[in-house]
Amino acid sequence: MNSLYYRDDTIELHVGDALHVMESLPSASVDCVVTSPPHWGLRDYGTAVWIGGNPECRHSLGTTPHQRRTTKKRTSSRLRSSVNKSCRKCGASAHDRQYGLEPTIEDYVDRLREVSAEIWRLLTPRGTYWLNLRDGFSYHNSGTGSTRKITTEEVPSVVRHKSLMGIPWRVALTLQQNGWIVRNAMVWHKPNGIPDPASDRFSSRYEMLFLLVKQPDYYFDAARALEPLSQNRPEHRKNHRGGNKPHTVRSPWHPRGAGKNVGDVWSISTRPLRDAHCSPFPIDLPQRCIAVGCTKNGRVLDPFSGAGTTGLAARQLGRSFQGIDLRPDYHDIFIRRLLGELPSGAGEAA
């Protein structure tokens, strides 16, 4: 089945499961991958296809506290995941290929391993793969809402209640075992992170961004990974080591090079996009990744493109872009942003 949804001179958008769509793309056709897969256990993006049951039914999964309690008593943890994929009113089954709703962490990690294996095939030998992942905590089964709780029945027995699960590093180490070089592990610090209601731990204010490559010799434009040096005026250097007399630093200091390496802690505020119900992803993040890790006139791929922020960054930097998503309405948002009907640089979403 043809997955192509939109195409212009530099943009190509596909609708479908990331793994299946990538299998149809030619090998060594992508120079850079920048992506943020749906985080495990965070939310349901509503991509299920209902089969059977009553077509007039307003389908609902069995996710009330009572249903969870009774299901827990009657079935094993593996079977519970399939029970919760049936409509509690008419019995229709929900078939869903979205990522992030896997029954266990191991299943989530394994699916990202499969996706990354296909990315390996698509990447050129010197290509770069930038993978943004968020961690989560293990909780008891309680409450309802659009944000799905990660329960103790869904995590390995060694992860205790309230424990941080280490999902980003579970994925990174799995990919390392599969041949990827984990070249960097950036901390994306979010100064304006959403308030955390927890009262017995510190608030979470960061996500991980991994730089993965196929070989030691890969494309990396170090000049695009620099930030300005501090002021070189004499008054800013009076208290240098060895003396504090102003006359000892009268002449300006001329730095070597254009700046210093930005390091592996990136402080970038989130900028939610009003029209897209997906995780905030500021355009500054893919811009830096693409500027540093994609050849000039190269091609960028985002297999979980959402509202297309990576695509906007690619276009602004003169690269072509391929995006994949299960939801065509997210592609529609991206197209509107390309056409200038929505802001392209203020409010961004992955």
Regions from the PLM with identified roles:
Residues 1-217, 224, 231-350:
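S-adenosyl-L-methionine-dependent nucleic acid methyltransferase catalytic domains
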